Amino acid sequence: MDGGQPIPSSLVPLGNESADSSMSLEQKMTFVFVILLFIFLGILIVRCFRILLDPYRSMPTSTWADGLEGLEKGQFDHALA
């Protein structure tokens, strides 16, 4: 049919190109970005499981009102002056 001539394909890299240059810079940057997103996702999953297993470890023992001196809880008049 074609007379024995090979069909050019953009999916197959040419013989004179190395394996590194088969990916463009944009593809390499996208690949690195996706890998970084997977690492970030893994860190978040580990952190969520740690919070689920021991939820009271990450909570502070004091409340916001413990630091107020001379003021009753909920009274904010002249607190910044």
UniProtKB/Swiss-Prot annotation:
Q: What keywords does the record list, in alphabetical order?
A: Membrane, Transmembrane, Transmembrane helix
Please name every pair of cysteines joined by a disulfide bond in this record.
none
Q: According to its UniProt record, where is this protein located?
A: Membrane
What sections of the protein cross the membrane? 29-49
**Entry's Gene Ontology cellular component terms:** membrane
PANTHER family with a match to the protein in the record: CORTEXIN-1-RELATED, CORTEXIN-3
Stated family: Belongs to the cortexin family.
According to UniProt, the name of this protein is Cortexin-3
The species is: Homo sapiens
Q: Which gene encodes it?
A: CTXN3
